[in-house]
Amino acid sequence: MTMKFELDKTSGRARRGRMVFERGTVETPAFMPVGTLGTVKGMTPEEVKDTGAQICLGNTFHLMLRPGTQIIQQHGDLHDFMNWDKPILTDSGGFQVFSLGELRKITEEGVTFRSPINGEKILLTPEKSMQVQRELGSDIVMIFDECTPFPATQAEARSSMELSLRWAERSKQEHGESKAALFGIIQGGMYEELRDISLKGLTDIGFDGYAIGGLSVGEPKEDMMRILEHTAPQMPEQKPRYLMGVGKPEDLVEAVRRGIDMFDCVMPTRNARNGHLFISTGVVKIRNAVHRTDTSPLDENCDCYTCKNYSRAYLHHLDRTNEMLGSRLNTIHNLRFYQKVMSDMRDALDAGTFDDYVKEFYRLRDQSVPALD
């Protein structure tokens, strides 16, 4: 079966729904932990599930280069390879190619680059990206696009967006009769009119879901919110809406307020490894000396394995001594915190108390609720 999206209820622009796959149901709004190389760094699949994750993200670009789809297919597909029995979304490789900067060359055909592993010259095209994602057995496949850099002139952003639209058409053609869901990615830089053209082009082609790409690439927060505010309400109502690569807990709340259903970001896992831990009142920098003698848990309100079993002083000690257990315990906590933010939003939407949830979320942080335009 292909993915089925059900929209249950709304509160303002915030949406409560679910995506139904053969491998399970994903209640939305949802956060997807990033498992770039077939692993959420330092975590077993069971531990990731225990945080509340319903779906995870894999990286086409990296998995194509190493270990390669041939080895993955010897196990079945990516689910079997990494022992994850829930849905997987794979990104197309477009963003990673964008990250290579000067090491890549973009043409109408695709992107040519040197493998960061062995220097081999590789051509990644929309067709190749679809083929690799099919071999990975992805449940949600992302089209191959060019992530518009920031800053970009309107002419540069237009040219990039138009190329992405042509690649979207080719991605859809190559995807063919595959049972996996195929999502289009809206580009257009920081220009509303280009975002509109991109969205219209993608909806004319027709996809199972739509993502906002090209944000969280170094632009000021105001620009991100401006584009999100403009674009999200125009996205098809009966299809999932995905904001790629975002963000902090506050960003998730603000994006849900504006109608987004899905998120992914490395922030909870990467910040965990750097000792930056999210709690209901803000961020704890566990490396700081103030935690050296603190016997209290990281977050009194958290039900994660870390908070139930260890003190701030112990986590501080692990961080200071560079013990790998520290990164693991921190990651368990941060991922659970993110999943709890999402499940609390879902519960509030179910109960019709979403506005109250938002007020309490910001009250705990000593912040006022940002205005919706």
UniProtKB/Swiss-Prot annotation:
Molecular function GO labels: metal ion binding; tRNA-guanosine(34) queuine transglycosylase activity
GO BP annotations listed: queuosine biosynthetic process; tRNA wobble guanine modification; tRNA-guanine transglycosylation
Active site residues according to the UniProt entry: 91 (proton acceptor), 264 (nucleophile)
Keyword tRNA processing: yes
Cofactor(s), by name: Zn(2+)
Residues engaged in binding substrate: 91-95, 145, 187, 214
Gene3D superfamilies, A to Z: Queuine tRNA-ribosyltransferase-like
Keywords linked to the UniProt accession: Glycosyltransferase, Metal-binding, Queuosine biosynthesis, Transferase, tRNA processing, Zinc
Cofactor: binding details: Binds 1 zinc ion per subunit.
Gene Ontology CC terms: cytosol
Chain intervals for the UniProt region annotation (RNA binding): 245-251, 269-273
Chain residues that bind Zn(2+): 302, 304, 307, 333
Pfam families for this protein: TGT
SUPFAM superfamilies in the cross-refs: tRNA-guanine transglycosylase (SSF51713)
Binding partners and assembly: Homodimer. Within each dimer, one monomer is responsible for RNA recognition and catalysis, while the other monomer binds to the replacement base PreQ1.
HAMAP family, per the entry: Q_tRNA_Tgt
Descriptive protein name: Queuine tRNA-ribosyltransferase
